[in-house]
Curated annotation (Swiss-Prot):
Residues 14-35 are annotated as: Disordered. It comes from the Archaea. It comes from Methanosphaerula palustris (strain ATCC BAA-1556 / DSM 19958 / E1-9c). Keywords: DNA-binding. This is DNA-binding protein Mpal_0536. Pfam families: dsDNA_bind. GO terms for molecular function: DNA binding. HAMAP family: dsDNA_bind. Residues 16-25 have a biased composition (Low complexity). InterPro entries: DNA_bind_arc, PDCD5-like, PDCD5-like_sf. NCBIfam families: PRK04239.1 (NF003268).
Length: 109
């Protein structure tokens, strides 16, 4: 392998790394825009107490909170939400969405 070939390989690898970095930056920016849009939509949909409750849930169950947020935004976009959701309404919605817990009774003989 000559110096020219080695330089060409280095140049290609550098171009590839730069391309990957730019793609990653674009993906990060897109995620940030989507997150901002979601937060703006939630501010219009939820009352402050309900937003606080959802933020608290996000700390303990991030996947569940993300699902609830997506459902709320979809409901709002489809026009099924006519007014801001209060904390009590959000509690009712969360109760419906949380899967029923299975109770286990252990009987010792």
């Amino acid at each position: 392998m000559g110096d020219d070939e080695l330089a060409e390989l280095r140049r290609r690898r550098m171009a590839q790394l730069q391309s990957q970095q730019m793609d990653q930056q674009q993906m990060d920016e897109e995620k940030q825009r989507a997150k901002s849009a979601m937060q703006m939509a939630l501010m219009q949909i939820l009352e402050p107490e309900a937003r606080e409750r959802l933020n608290t849930i996000r700390l303990t169950k991030p996947e569940f909170a993300a699902g609830v947020e997506q459902q709320l935004v979809m409901l709002a976009q489809s026009g099924r939400i006519k007014q801001k959701i209060s904390d009590a309404q959000l509690k009712d919605l969360l109760r419906q969405l949380i899967p029923a817990k299975k109770d286990f009774n252990i009987v010792r003989k």
